[in-house]
Amino acid sequence: AFAGVLADADIKAALAGCAAAESFNYKTFFKFFAIIDQDHSGFIEEEELKLFLQTFSAGARALSDAETK
């Protein structure tokens, strides 16, 4: 799903980071999820997804309706 979106080297590095059994860091995953899930509902709603780029930079644009469907 990320092929063509992320660089192959980045995908390989992410997979290598949790290649060993029991090495997946769920705390890091949920930290990232919590940043996007701004209302802490346990779901990422469309309105939160629209603001996804702003988690990287406050001045980033909001995604359009078409981009979040």
Swiss-Prot record:
One of its GO terms (molecular function) is calcium ion binding. Residues 24-59 form the EF-hand domain. Ca(2+) binds at residues 37, 39, 41, 43, 45, 48. SUPFAM superfamilies: EF-hand. InterPro entries: EF-hand-dom_pair, EF_Hand_1_Ca_BS, EF_hand_dom, Parvalbumin. Gene3D superfamilies: EF-hand. Keywords: Acetylation, Allergen, Calcium, Metal-binding, Muscle protein. One of its GO terms (cellular component) is cytoplasm. The modification N-acetylalanine is found at residue 1. Pfam families: EF-hand_6 (PF13405). Is regarded as an important allergen. On the 2D-gel the determined pI of this protein is: 4.02, its MW is: 11.39 kDa. Belongs to the parvalbumin family. In muscle, parvalbumin is thought to be involved in relaxation after contraction. It binds two calcium ions. This is Parvalbumin beta 4. It comes from Merluccius merluccius (European hake).
